[in-house]
Regions:
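Outer-membrane beta-barrel translocator/receptor signature
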Residues: 130-134, 146-150, 155, 160-233, ...
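Acidic, small-polar-rich N-terminal luminal/periplasmic segments of exported/outer-membrane proteins
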Residues: 36-181, 555
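Membrane-embedded beta-barrel scaffold of Gram-negative outer-membrane proteins
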Residues: 227, 313-314, 322-341, 503, ...
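Transmembrane beta-barrel wall of Gram-negative outer-membrane proteins
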Residues: 197-226, 236-283, 304-306, 386, ...
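C-terminal beta-signal and adjacent terminal beta-strands/loops
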Residues: 126, 518, 574-576, 676-680, ...
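Structural signature of Gram-negative outer-membrane beta-barrels, strongest in the C-terminal barrel
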Residues: 262-264, 391, 397, 431-574, ...
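Outer-membrane beta-barrel domain signature, strongest for Gram-negative TonB-dependent receptors
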Residues: 244-402, 565-567
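Gram-negative outer-membrane beta-barrel transporters
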Residues: 34, 379, 451, 458, ...
Length: 758
């Protein structure tokens, strides 16, 4: 038993200090906790997301990386873009004008195609209304980073286990439990202070936990006050040429509560409550070239999210199941924005584009709300038939989401003294899609079969999904949609998967998987509509949208030596009926909205393909010293149009040199870079194409004793001026846009955090 465990230990490849079965049996392991990217280490790490059950990372036939609480504290990120900055296959575009980090992009797939969960509960949808006014956006609201004990990222389609919305991958956040604070004591806690010069933000965290073997509790609270994220711009004017950031005041606060009840050795209950809210005030001093009559503007955003869940776990001593887990949950999220504009020398109707002699004040409001109710049930069973070991899981997921959106506006013409609720042909309030309900039900099963004394693993899986979209009758949408009523929609889909892993030697694992993916069209894509008759454009609903479907083939290899660990993966993802918003040929297309020059609509694209390769590795060349690195390459095409996919980033890489003592002291120098942007779809307009870059960060950390730890960092050490392609394309920056330095990344900044444990 011990010899077999040692062989499996040599084949492990990931980064985080999770002590598992082999460690418990006395197997030696190298303790290493990287400060930067999720690198590879000789620990028998356990992951959950890839199989929905605890599994050794080296036994997973997919690409998955993790970060733990210590790595997050040392990296000191302020948003998801910072959290995943050293992962070259992950991109988190920021709206540098106002809203910040929005949605996660994995291997060129983003937005609501990447499933994000906190403690098994899906985060709210990402919504972006677009347009030059930039007033209607709602992010997915990642959890408070100081509450996290772990983050797992699974690449590629995961619909066979998680259903719709996981067609591009899964990001799973796990929050801390009482035991993470008590550390074996009856009572424990932590206090934290952090400051980051990237946005002059100062944060405070506090947590306490305690209890007995039967009952345990935890409560944590966090608060942060910050300002605008820095860049390398110098023009401080209130104009279209401004390059310095728009001034911001940002406040966020959060709290987390947990109660764990071990009613008996076999029965455990878990109650969780999480709250987050934030407010941002922005002086929108950089003006839009598309809105020449807007001469001053400011914005305010409020967001809130509340989640409550009750979990149950049953582990019988014997019986039909080894484990039964269930969770019921409710989550409510809301984003509201208010934008105030001064429009000068404008028309009597206060147009943003038409010249006139009027002076106007325009107030524009936006609200997006989701209420989510659901449950999941999963059973696990291990057994043997002949010489084959089986690990069977199966279960059901159900989720009901009620979504609503609205826009409002008040227009005051200061020259004529009139006030109206009409602007640019729209009569407020208005809905861009009807309020309604989406239901998703999924049944899944997977059998992990081990042959030849565990050296070969074959895992078939299958999931059945049914979804239904039920809009309310909504006159506020009907008029915008050209008199086309909102439609209900439902569909069912099977998502199979087959993966294989072969332990070729004690040091080499080879794996492959063939996975089917699936995503149902959402409320905005099916029933969304918009009209701007003054400027002559709009968006039409599409009741005929089909679900997206994908087929993904991925192969990989992992090698683990005494001082070298490395892995490589090759993937080819093909998407059919990919949903994308396109401009219609008007007026010949029957879907065109009457009276408008241009109509946009979500359409199914016949074929989209993304393929690429990734490499990760670590080399411990001396005691306490190691080098790690990662490279990601992807190539994407819309095969219907022959155009590149703008969501695919150029080749990117990261590397680091780390010195670390087991006592908790260490330092790292990290580099990350990208090739120049050359492949873009410029059919609508010509994008500004960022040059390649390479930046260096320094990190240091010191654990003085079991109670006090300090982390310091210098980001962009050499004050490099550079742009990220994700930020550029998210905003739609053209090659002729003035003041592109507005979209540059921060220069040299400093950060520090102090943590007290008791």
């Amino acid at each position: 038993m011990k010899r077999r465990c040692l062989a499996r230990l040599r084949a492990s490849v990931r980064v985080t200090p999770v002590a598992a079965v082999c460690a418990a049996l006395g197997s030696p392991a190298l303790a290493a906790d990287g400060a930067g990217t999720a690198t590879l280490v000789a620990l028998n790490e356990v992951v959950v997301t890839a199989t929905r059950t605890e599994e050794r990372a080296d036994a997973v036939a997919s690409t998955i990386t993790t970060r733990d609480a210590r790595q997050i504290q040392r990296a000191q990120p302020v948003d998801e873009a910072g959290l995943f900055a050293d992962e070259p296959d992950i991109d988190v575009p920021r709206d540098r004008r106002r809203f910040g980090a929005g949605s996660i992009n994995i291997r060129g797939i983003e937005d609501n195609r990447v499933l994000q969960m906190v403690d098994g509960v899906r985060l709210p949808d990402f919504f972006n209304g677009g347009g030059p006014s930039n007033i209607s956006s709602s992010t997915r609201d990642a959890p408070e980073f100081s509450f996290l004990k772990r983050v797992e990222v699974l690449r590629g389609p995961a619909s066979s286990l998680y259903g719709s919305d996981a067609i591009g991958g899964v990001v799973a956040y796990a929050t801390k439990d009482p035991s993470d604070l008590t550390q074996g004591r009856k009572v424990g806690g932590e206090l934290g202070l952090n400051w980051n010069g990237i946005d002059n933000g100062f944060g405070q965290t506090a947590g306490v936990a305690g209890g007995s073997d039967t009952l345990q509790g935890l409560f944590m609270v966090a608060n942060r006050n910050a300002h605008e994220m820095k860049n390398m711009g110098s023009d401080d004017s209130n104009s279209v040429s401004r390059t310095r950031p728009n001034p911001q005041d940002v406040r966020t606060q959060a709290w987390l509560g947990k109660i764990l009840l071990n009613a008996s050795p076999a029965h455990k209950f878990r109650f969780t409550y999480e709250h987050r809210d934030g407010n941002t005030d922005t002086d929108l001093l950089r003006l839009s070239t598309a809105l020449p009559r807007v001469t001053a503007a400011n914005g305010n955003e409020d967001l809130s999210r509340d989640r409550v869940s009750l979990g149950y776990e049953w582990k019988p001593a014997s019986g039909v199941l080894d484990r039964l887990a269930a969770q019921v949950y409710y989550q409510e999220s809301e984003t509201t924005t208010l934008t105030s504009q001064v429009r000068s020398n404008t028309s009597t109707g206060c147009s943003a584009t038409t010249r006139g002699s009027s002076l106007c004040n325009v107030s524009l409001g936006f609200a997006f709300k989701q209420e989510q109710t659901g449950f999941n049930l999963q059973g696990d069973k291990s057994f043997a038939t002949g010489g084959v070991e089986h690990r069977l899981i199966g279960g059901v997921d159900f989720m009901r989401v009620r979504s609503s959106e609205s826009r409002d506006g008040t227009v005051r013409n200061l020259t004529t003294g009139t006030t109206t609720k009409s602007l640019a042909g729209e009569n407020f309030p208005i809905h861009d899609f009807p309020t309604g309900e989406t239901r998703q039900t999924g049944l899944f099963a997977q059998d992990e079969m081990r042959f030849f004394d565990g050296r070969f693993t074959l895992t078939p899986g299958l999931r059945f999904d049914h979804y239904s979209l039920s809009p309310d009758g909504d006159d506020l949408v009907y008029n915008n949609a050209g008199g086309r009523p909102a439609v209900s929609k439902s569909d069912s889909h099977l998502s199979p998967k087959l993966s294989a892993l072969w332990q070729a030697t004690d040091r080499v694992n080879l794996w492959a998987q063939y996975v089917f993916g699936y995503r149902a069209p959402n409320y905005q894509e099916v029933n969304g509509s918009f009209r701007n008759p003054v400027q002559g454009y709009g968006a039409a609903p599409n009741a005929a949208l089909d679900p997206e479907k994908s087929r993904s083939f991925e192969i990989g290899a992992r090698y683990t030596g005494d001082n070298v660990q490395t892995s490589v993966a090759l993937f080819d993802n093909r998407y059919r009926d990919f949903i994308e918003q396109v401009q219609l040929t008007c007026p010949s297309d029957p879907a065109c909205l009457p009276g408008l020059r241009a109509t946009y609509q979500y359409r199914n694209q016949a074929s989209v393909r993304i393929y690429g390769a990734e490499w990760r590795g670590v080399w411990r060349f001396l005691p306490q010293w190691r080098i790690d690195g990662a490279v990601a390459y992807a190539h994407g095409n819309n095969e219907q149009t022959g155009q590149p996919l703008n969501s695919v980033s150029p080749l990117r890489a990261s590397a680091g040199l780390t010195w670390e003592r087991v006592q908790g002291q260490g330092a790292a120098i990290r580099w990350r870079g990208a090739r120049p942007v050359t492949r873009t779809d410029d059919s609508s307009f010509t994008y500004f194409k960022p040059a390649g870059y390479g930046v260096v960060d320094l990190q240091a950390w010191w654990r003085f004793n079991r109670y006090v730890s300090l982390a310091l960092s210098v980001n962009n050490l050499f004050d490099k001026k550079y742009w990220l392609w994700g930020d550029v394309r998210q905003t739609g920056v053209s090659a002729t846009e003035p003041g592109v330095d507005f979209y540059t990344q921060p220069g040299r900044t400093f950060a520090a955090s102090l943590k007290l444990s008791f």
